[in-house]
Amino acid sequence: MKKNINVRKINKRSIVIKIIFFITIVVIIYGILEFNKINNEKNSSRLLEWEKSLKTNIFHARVKTILKEDEIKENIQKIGLTGINNKNIFFSVYDNNENIIYKIGKDGENIVPASIAKIYTLVYVLDILKDYDKEKKVKAGNEIELNSKDASAAGLIKGKEYKINDLISSAVIISAGDSVYTLTKIAYNLEKGIEINTDILKNNSTKDEKSKVVSDISEHITKYLRKKIKLSDDTNITDPTGILNTSKTSYKDMYILMKYIYSNKDKMKEIISNAETAEMQISGDFLSGKGQKLTNTNPFLNKKSSWYEDGVVGLKTGTLRGWNNLFSIFKKSDGNYYGIITVGFENRKDVNMLTKELIRRIKNESINSKGN
């Protein structure tokens, strides 16, 4: 009898323990759900504030970070990006009235421009050649040897002549390094007042001699841009093509550069008229005389690509290890232009996703240059 009573007590105690355990689990689950609910509400509130900022905050000729540094990753993840561990991620949107509409990134961080450095070089080249007939042919020389073997190239042949406009097209559309070097040579010679086709690199140059020419030309371009368009000391181009990861710039200087391109309509027209081309046939002087079909490296211009976006007009992709960059202009249906810079991402997909998202926000006026 006593044994049965003890068994019942044990069973009763076991039931009580199970009930308490169950209640505890329920309370914990409820707590987690409530925590997630509150957290989601906070996140939703932050996103609404973010949307509000995108609509109303226009920063005239100045740079300001809307989101705090510790919020950057969280908000980017909301868009669906994954490879965002690079501390140098930065993106911005600005309109054709030279207003910075939206910016996110760290103040004072240096950016590796990669192939976007070609735009810096082209601004220098087109500035020097502004009164020169770009339908004229110029001769490729020893400078094409300066282009890295693993870099993009148009296949220029030493001694052959090419239209300047074709060189510009290949530099922008397929990121041709050899064309960039030939353009740099003729601009440098014209600026110095010497015969335009004069070689800047002697025959049979050593590796050190080639490096010195690249260094000297790059230093000249950097100094020119600092003086002409007031780039800061943050910008230091060490190779006209951007193939070296030692080239540096900043998002402030990127903005200044784009502002200069926007304010100089001829410059903008010259660069964009090439950058907006998805594919084009250039003259028979390229390669074996049969001409060459160029396909733009910007996926947003390729109608066969899933990234294709009507209204995108170049400008430039840039890729080095750990640096996937895209420097684009989007033309909205109302005729307004928007410059979009996305730099420092670890993979090309993230750059494309973010650019696509920013374009979507421009279209539906989540980013609105008339917000004020």
Can you describe what each PLM-predicted range is?
Residues N97-E109:
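Short, conserved catalytic-motif segment at the N-terminal edge
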Residues M1-I15:
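N-terminal Lys/Arg-rich, disordered targeting/topogenic segments
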Residues D127-E145, D233-D234, K265-E276:
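Short, well-structured active-site flanking segments
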Residues I28-N43:
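Membrane-interface motif at the C-terminal end of an N-terminal transmembrane signal
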Residues E143-S170:
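Signal peptide-directed extracytoplasmic domains
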Residues N39-Y94, I100-I101, E161-L167, K185-N372:
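Penicillin-recognizing serine hydrolase domain
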Residues E98, V112-A140, N147, M254:
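Active-site SXXK
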Residues K18-G31:
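Hydrophobic membrane-insertion alpha-helices, especially the h-region
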